[in-house]
Amino acid sequence: MKKLQFAMVGGGNGALIGDIHRIGAQFDDLAELKAGCFSRHWDKNLEAGEKWGVEPGRIYPDYHTMLEEEAKRTGEDRLDFVVVATPNNTHYEIVKDIIAHGFHIVCDKPVTFTSRESEELKALAGKLDEINATHLDRRI
C-alpha cells in the first residue's frame, strides 16, 4: 500500500500540537511528511524540516508558496493532504487557501470562529469533493 504523503503548515520545533499531528499521522506507518512551512522564521523552518527528514526543496518560506508549488506536482509525487497546526485565528484563511489548491485537509481545532465561516468552508470543500477533517486531540 502506498503511504499517504502530507505537508504541514505550522507546528515547528517546540510546538506541541505539531508533534501530536506529525506523530499521529505517521503512527501506523501509512503516512509520510513530505513538505511544509513549519515557521515564519526561515532558520527555524529549515531546522524543523531537516529534523523531520523533509527534502530541502520542499521546505517553503510561507504556506502560499508551498501550496502553489505543491499543487504543480502530479502522480506519486503529489500530496494527499495538508495538516494545519497554526494559531487558531489563522485557520480559516489557511484552510480556504488549501481548498482552493485542491488538497484534503486535517486542521487543528477550531477550524473557524463563526458558523458563517464554517458553512463557507463546507460549501467550498464540498464542491471539490475534498475532505476537511478537524483534529480533536486527547478528547474522550
Question: For the regions a protein language model found, what residue spans apply to each?
Answer:
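A contiguous active-site-proximal alpha/beta segment in oxidoreductase catalytic domains
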Residues: 112-140
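Rossmann-fold NAD(P) dinucleotide-binding segment
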Residues: 78-81, 89-108
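Hydrophobic Val/Ile/Leu positions in short beta-strands of Rossmann-like dinucleotide-binding domains
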Residues: 8-10, 84, 107, 111
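A structured beta-alpha segment of the ubiquitous adenosine-cofactor-binding alpha/beta core
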Residues: 58-80
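Aromatic/hydrophobic pocket-lining residues that form π-stacking "cages" and hydrophobic walls in ligand
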Residues: 45, 94, 121
